[in-house]
């Protein structure tokens, strides 16, 4: 395996981070944050349709288990904002914290669709599914969502 997997901000390192985040909770509107009651309450106020009472038990379970959460584009932004995921994985299930810098490494705070438009405006290649190159870590976007 390439040594690039150990080098932050390479596509291989990013993919390794994403793979370690598989199975962690999806909280709408979050960007690689520790699950806390304060965060849940703020997001419930900001996005009431996504934080209804039917989901509260699940959110509180995530909090009790000291998990880390993100939404789709939040995973991408969070990797950048935490300096390549520094300390994130180690904090899962513990009381450890990690640093996050809003807009870190030049990564803007945009929605999935907004990030797609931003990438196009910066000259990034894009196309249809049949033109998608087999490059680990490439973003695949459809309206309102993005995956790696």
Regions found by a protein language model. Name each.
Residues 31-33, 103, 121-123:
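Short linear sequence elements within intrinsically disordered, low-complexity coil regions
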Residues 10, 71, 111, 128-129:
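Helix N-cap and loop-to-helix transition residues
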Residues 85-120:
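Short, basic/aromatic beta-hairpin or loop at an interaction surface
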Residues 131, 141:
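Short, glycine/acidic-rich beta->alpha junctions
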Residues 120-130:
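Short alpha-helix capping/helix-loop boundary micro-motifs
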Residues 134-137:
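Loop/turn positions that initiate beta-strands
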Residues 1-92, 142-145:
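N-terminal capping segments
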């Amino acid at each position: 395996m390439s040594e690039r997997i150990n080098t932050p901000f390479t596509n291989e390192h990013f993919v390794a981070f994403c793979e370690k985040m598989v199975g962690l909770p999806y909280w709408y509107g979050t960007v690689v944050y520790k699950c806390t009651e304060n965060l849940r309450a703020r997001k419930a106020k900001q996005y009431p349709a996504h934080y209804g009472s039917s989901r509260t038990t699940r959110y509180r379970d995530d909090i009790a288990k000291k998990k880390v959460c993100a939404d789709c584009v939040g995973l991408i932004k969070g990797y950048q904002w935490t300096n390549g995921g520094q300390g994130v994985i180690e904090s899962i299930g513990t009381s450890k914290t990690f640093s996050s810098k809003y807009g870190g490494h030049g990564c803007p705070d945009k929605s999935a669709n907004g990030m797609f438009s931003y990438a196009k405006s910066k000259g990034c290649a894009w196309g249809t599914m049949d033109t998608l190159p087999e490059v680990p870590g490439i973003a695949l976007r459809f309206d309102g969502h993005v995956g790696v």
